[in-house]
Amino acid sequence: MYRLSSSMLPRALAQAMRTGHLNGQSLHSSAVAATYKYVNKKEQESEVDMKSATDNAARILMWTELIRGLGMTLSYLFREPATINYPFEKGPLSPRFRGEHALRRYPSGEERCIACKLCEAICPAQAITIEAEPRADGSRRTTRYDIDMTKCIYCGFCQEACPVDAIVEGPNFEFSTETHEELLYNKEKLLNNGDKWEAEIAANIQADYLYR
């Protein structure tokens, strides 16, 4: 809101004449404009105060959050680490962990697989290929047992379907390779895995026996 002060009108007229406003309309307009005063200063001051308060609150909040974050960081320096020093340290694995595949043998050394092909039939990724032939005693044994590990989804269906616990997913999870061909497992590779991890595989099957 602006208000015209009559006491300042002569001074404003003189100032307008000095600045070159000689015509009457321009002289009167300049003089009137020079005599306006903004009298509603409380609203302007309140806006300035509100802005200052907002800036101060934001500044205080920023420093508060910064100090709180630094305090939390320092508190974790004196706690036990939540991570392990892998690969020199390894965490526990569940007996149901599904890792690298393996073919097992009986304690006598005879391979367990009876070439029923249930694992091949149930595999949703069609990663298993089996060929078999009968023996002289009438039993069937595999002549070919291949698993394409690049197709395998580690669902565990092959292990669940096997009636003699021949094909299993062992505890090994460190079997990365440099070539694609190394992930095409044949029967010899699978039997070697079974011989290597037999103790752990047998213990896991025994631990999970009551829940199957």
Curated annotation (Swiss-Prot):
Co-factor: note: Binds 2 [4Fe-4S] cluster.
EC number annotated for this UniProt entry: 7.1.1.2
Span of the signal peptide: none
Binding site for [4Fe-4S] cluster 1: 113, 116, 119, 162
GO CC aspect terms: mitochondrial inner membrane; mitochondrion; respiratory chain complex I
Membrane topology per record: Peripheral membrane protein
Keywords from the UniProt entry: 4Fe-4S, Electron transport, Iron, Iron-sulfur, Membrane, Metal-binding, Mitochondrion, Mitochondrion inner membrane, NAD, Oxidoreductase, Repeat, Respiratory chain, Transit peptide, Translocase, Transport, Ubiquinone
InterPro entries in the record: 4Fe4S_Fe-S-bd, 4Fe4S_Fe_S_CS, NADH_quinone_OxRdtase_chainI
GO biological process, one term: aerobic respiration
Transit peptide: 1-34
Keyword presence, Transmembrane: no
Domain 4Fe-4S ferredoxin-type: 104-133, 143-172
Top-level taxon of origin: Eukaryota
Cofactor(s) it depends on: [4Fe-4S] cluster
Chemical reaction(s) catalysed: a ubiquinone + NADH + 5 H(+)(in) = a ubiquinol + NAD(+) + 4 H(+)(out)
Gene Ontology molecular functions: 4 iron, 4 sulfur cluster binding; metal ion binding; NADH dehydrogenase (ubiquinone) activity
UniProt cross-references to NCBIfam families, sorted A to Z: NuoI (TIGR01971), PRK05888.1-4 (NF004538), PRK05888.1-5 (NF004539)
Function: Core subunit of the mitochondrial membrane respiratory chain NADH dehydrogenase (Complex I) which catalyzes electron transfer from NADH through the respiratory chain, using ubiquinone as an electron acceptor. Essential for the catalytic activity and assembly of complex I.
Family membership noted in the UniProt record: Belongs to the complex I 23 kDa subunit family.
Subunit structure: Complex I is composed of 45 different subunits. This is a component of the iron-sulfur (IP) fragment of the enzyme. Interacts with RAB5IF.
This protein's name: NADH dehydrogenase [ubiquinone] iron-sulfur protein 8, mitochondrial
Species this chain originates from: Mus musculus
